[in-house]
Amino acid sequence: MIGRYGGPDKRRSPRHDRRFMATLEYQGNTHEIRTIDISEHGVLIPKRLPPPIGTCVKLTLTIRNEASEFEGVVTRHTRCLVNGVESVGVGIDISSNEYREFVKNKILIA
């Protein structure tokens, strides 16, 4: 099956187009970003200079002025569109049960 941005679709759960403020931290750097999409297993974010695949990251998602912090791993780089402009998307796998509950209880109802 072909994914949304032309590559193979390897998703374990459906994507939800949701734009939330997020803070990405890795290798001593902090970046303020917005999500492109979210699933129960991770997020896709835009990043012009993406961290290498395999990089451990900390992602803080802010929804309705409430911040929640999760740890994940960069699993892929892909092409994506952000406001009609082609960009690099960074797929971050977040495999904690807390994150899945967060998505079910906060994201899907937002």
Positions of the model-derived regions?
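Short, solvent-exposed secondary-structure boundary/capping segments
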Residues: L44-K47, T78-I94
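Short beta-strand-centered aromatic/proline hotspots
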Residues: I33-R34, F70-H77
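N-terminal helix initiation/capping motif
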Residues: M1-I38, E101-A110
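Short, conserved charged micro-motifs
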Residues: I53-T55, R100-F102
